């Protein structure tokens, strides 16, 4: 008898630091709660679950019953917890010592809540740079999942239905390739089509899926499709009935199967990033949006000041503010606004102001100083007076880069210039972003839609 296909099913849950409570509560009602409730009714379905630390803390405070449900499924072995950065930073974009602290913070949060330590990590936005390998390895994390296109770009051919290994400075990390086919089928195609696609995987190999849980209820039309019309219930029932499919957690598959071999990946992120930025590397957002680069370099400077303090003075409140300022959401944009959303940028500046004020109480800065704050080769002048911090750029006629009021935790110079975006062409022509991927029956992925809450004049 042939060996079954091993379905590795992972979901990732995250809400931006600084998001509105009512938005998170709606996500719980329309996505997190019904997904977990449906999953618990199907104990033969194994899932690897990543929840960002900031969101996990929120759920534990406001929705303890859902956290208790996770704990029950952990104890039964139905799910495993996946680690990562606590506030969902792009690991490649923050200093190594902060990477390790962020990874440790979520590991400890999971240990304290559930009594387990994760062995795998979620890479924020699946941004890959080899520099993250030692940080992950030394943090006790042994595997990550990235898009299968990452491995294709490294020259791997053939079926991507197992995991590979890489190393940096002699420290190994294993890499699971996420199937693009499954990402575009789940949850948009009929459940029968999804099961058929999984069953086409060769015997004994892995069908690998890991993607945002918010696709299951928050993305357009998905709540009705996934829950009210019973798509998720049907999918789990069909998987359980299949003689070809056996679900496993990533960790169990990792323990029981050998690596396919060594691979070295180029610096990259997921395929869709090319729709928002040519080149597909996340760090290039900092070049396209100088406002994001300013926040990023200000956060890096605050990190250096924090780590320059004696260990005994590095308060937990400082580290928390630093970690919150490193949350990825306000530094770039994809489908959901990101740097274009003022409240996400405001969250970064609020946490920077909190951290700077605490640092100044221990290590005051001079009233004025010249330095290249944003590392673009041109000096800025930083001014401090009373409750205010200001940064001026002489090379641009004395332009004000930042005017932060510490008591208000607000930067009054936090504005964003309007820029032409490539995807405006889709808006102008009123078409689908990916007409070649549109299929019936089922529902359209958000990547294939052109829809707006308000009218846009590109």
Task: Please name every model-derived segment.
Residues 5-95, 101-102, 117-123, 142-148, ...:
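Short, well-structured secondary-structure segments
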Residues 33-34, 61-76, 154-167, 191-198:
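Alpha-helical scaffolding within the catalytic cores
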Residues 90, 149-160, 176-189, 193-194:
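Positively charged, amphipathic and often flexible ligand-engagement surfaces
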């Amino acid at each position: 008898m042939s060996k079954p296909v091993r379905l590795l099913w992972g979901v990732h849950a995250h809400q931006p630091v600084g998001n509105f409570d009512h938005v998170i509560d709606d996500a719980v009602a329309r996505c997190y709660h019904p997904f977990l409730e449906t999953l618990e009714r199907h104990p033969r379905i194994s899932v690897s679950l990543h929840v960002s630390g900031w969101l996990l803390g929120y759920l534990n405070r406001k929705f303890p019953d859902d956290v208790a449900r996770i704990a029950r499924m952990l104890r039964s072995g139905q799910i495993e917890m996946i680690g990562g950065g606590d506030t969902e930073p792009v690991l490649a974009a923050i200093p190594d010592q902060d990477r390790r602290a962020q990874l440790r913070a979520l590991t400890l949060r999971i240990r304290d809540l559930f009594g387990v330590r994760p062995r795998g990590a979620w890479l924020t936005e699946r941004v890959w740079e080899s520099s993250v390998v030692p940080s992950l390895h030394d943090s006790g994390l042994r595997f990550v999942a990235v898009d299968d296109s990452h491995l294709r770009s490294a020259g791997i051919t053939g079926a991507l239905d197992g995991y590979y290994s890489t190393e940096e400075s002699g420290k190994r990390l294993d890499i699971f390739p996420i199937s693009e086919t499954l990402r575009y089928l789940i949850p948009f195609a009929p459940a029968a089509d999804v099961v058929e696609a999984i069953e086409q995987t060769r015997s004994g190999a892995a069908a690998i899926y890991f993607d945002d849980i918010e696709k299951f209820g928050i993305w357009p039309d998905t709540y009705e499709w996934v829950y009210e019309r019973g798509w998720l219930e049907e999918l789990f029932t069909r998987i359980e009935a299949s003689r070809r499919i056996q679900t496993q957690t990533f960790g169990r598959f990792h323990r029981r199967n050998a690596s396919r071999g060594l691979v070295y990946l180029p610096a990259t992120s997921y395929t869709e990033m090319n729709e928002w930025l040519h080149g597909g590397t996340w760090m290039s957002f900092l070049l396209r949006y100088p406002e994001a680069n300013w926040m990023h370099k200000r956060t890096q400077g605050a990190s250096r000041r924090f780590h320059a303090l004696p260990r005994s003075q590095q308060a937990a409140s400082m580290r928390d503010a630093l970690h919150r300022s490193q949350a990825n959401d306000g530094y770039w944009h994809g489908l959901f606004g990101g740097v274009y959303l003022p409240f996400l940028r405001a969250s970064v500046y609020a946490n920077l102001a909190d951290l700077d004020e605490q640092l100044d109480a221990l290590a005051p800065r001079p009233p004025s100083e010249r330095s290249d704050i944003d590392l673009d080769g041109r000096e800025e002048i930083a001014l401090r007076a009373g409750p205010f911090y200001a940064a001026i750029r002489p090379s641009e006629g004395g332009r004000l880069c930042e005017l932060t009021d510490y008591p208000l935790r607000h930067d009054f110079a936090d504005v964003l210039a309007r820029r032409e975006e490539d995807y405006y062409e889709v808006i102008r022509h009123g078409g689908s972003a990916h007409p070649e991927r549109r299929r019936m029956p089922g529902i359209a992925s958000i990547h294939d839609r052109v829809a707006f809450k308000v009218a846009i004049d590109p």
